Amino acid sequence: MRRATLIPLAIWVAGAAAAAAASLPQFPSCDISLANIGLSQNSQIFFPNGSGWESETIRWTKYMAPTYAVSVRPAHVSDVTQVRFATRCKIPFLASSGQHGFDTELAELQNGMEIDLSAFRNVSVDAKKNTLTVGGGVRFMDVFDPVFNAGKEIRTSETDHQVGTGSGACVGMISPTLGGGVGRLSGTHGIISDQLLSVQMVTANGSLVTVSKKENSNLFWGLRGAGGNFGIVVEAVYQVTDLTSEKVVNLDYAFSTNDTGAIIDYLALFGPNMPPKLSFIIAALYNEKLFGGVGDPGCVDPNRGRQSANTIPPSLFQFAVIVSGLYAGPQSEAEQLLAPLLQNATLIKQNISVVPENKLVYAATFGSQGNSTIACSGKGVNRSIFGGAINTYDKATYVDFLKAFGDLVTTNTDLRGSVFFIEHFSNYQVQKIPDHTSAYPWRDITAHLLFNYAWNDPANQQLMLYSARKLPRLRALKKEWDPENVFRFHHPISMS
């Protein structure tokens, strides 16, 4: 396991229910119909140019996106097992839920079949057994209220650690779980995959198997970190426990890029030792729409305090650095921890609120992480993600970069949707789970950086995703469970 402090970076620069068979030119020997595929009558099939096709297949980003000749929406688990039809006909396919995946390998699927799991959005909490059961199409927004209203929270199994859900309300829950599942409460809650108890999974040959510590335990190891390579998860069971704290403190601040150095100095104070209850998302973006422009009542004049008049220079609203903090404890402690930053940076706008944990995702980052924001609206837009890892914050690099980035998006209107993120979460609870327990390899990462930019390094991708120490075991699992490599379009594992 890597012991250096690593900071991963990223940039973002059917006719429904068709009854008649359709022979597609791409697959002339396989007529596509409910009966021929073996689907139940409540399932649906969509074709290009048919009713509902665009809404069925449109993705959050159209950059390097897969394309489909047909989309199937199964109604029951038994319908998903008919994936054997696609494998028999050599039809490349991809299961989808929130449709937020942005990995460039997705573009290798062209004129294939989408298996839409949106009918599987069932959520149930068993308060006596302390379990949460979700369908394969569930989004994070589907579980916030049921878990909270049951007086429960998600925790890692076999420990007393809490585990938080993600930062985007409309993103599917299963895919992040299979990749590990970091979140804003990772310091106190750990990663989502550590509390996964079992899944029901459809394999490439159409078999429905249970995967847990007791059944197919070796595969269970691989699912938690590289799960998209082995099958389609149609149901997952998580550990939950009694709610320990109903509310958290949300702290949002806006600064100009003149304060980039002060922000980086502040983050560097914590490094890999971020307090467990504290986390930050830093967003550098052109913010006119987000803040409503000059005169926003949340604006702060550094010399005269909060202002409702147009006292802030317009240039400060064109590009800004947003610091969105979260503290899972008393507000007084949170404000004490933020004091060094506020003493050294010029505040433009702030919002401090104490919110129920199940509403945090809607309040954070000035309300930009809820249903109507970056992750949950504007599908079909060109968005590309660059990712990497660094050992430390280099102040001069960030100061120079954000100045240049701000100038670029301010003067080029077509680029104003680009955002640079730093996600600095505590890994306190993440590191308490031994590295060998799952395929997830990056428990020692300090922060995540996201940038809207197109880049890929296929030669090193598997090492970046899974690490040299995990790949041999993962490749053996791949040969055992998917020897034909049909699950190869999202963070794929090669078998050699």
Curated annotation (Swiss-Prot):
Disulfide bridge map: none
Cofactors (names): FAD
InterPro entries in alphabetical order: BBE (IPR012951), FAD-bd_PCMH (IPR016166), FAD-bd_PCMH-like_sf (IPR036318), FAD-bd_PCMH_sub2 (IPR016169), FAD-linked_Oxidoreductase (IPR050416), Oxid_FAD_bind_N (IPR006094)
Function: FAD-linked oxidoreductase; part of the gene cluster that mediates the biosynthesis of fumigermin that inhibits germination of spores of the inducing S.rapamycinicus, and thus helps the fungus to defend resources in the shared habitat against a bacterial competitor. The partially reducing polyketide synthase fngA alone is sufficient for the production of fumigermin. FgnA catalyzes the condensation of 3 malonyl-CoA units to an acetyl-CoA starter, and 3 methylations to yield fumigermin.
Induction note: Expression is up-regulated during co-cultivation of A.fumigatus with Streptomyces rapamycinicus that triggersthe production of the polyketide fumigermin during the bacterial-fungal interaction.
GO molecular-function terms, A-Z: FAD binding; oxidoreductase activity
Record keyword Glycoprotein present: yes
Catalytic class of the enzyme: oxidoreductase
Protein's name according to its UniProt entry: FAD-linked oxidoreductase AFUA_1G00980
Enzyme Commission (EC) number: 1.-.-.-
The family this protein is said to belong to: Belongs to the oxygen-dependent FAD-linked oxidoreductase family.
FAD-binding PCMH-type domain span: 64-243
Keywords of this entry: FAD, Flavoprotein, Glycoprotein, Oxidoreductase, Signal
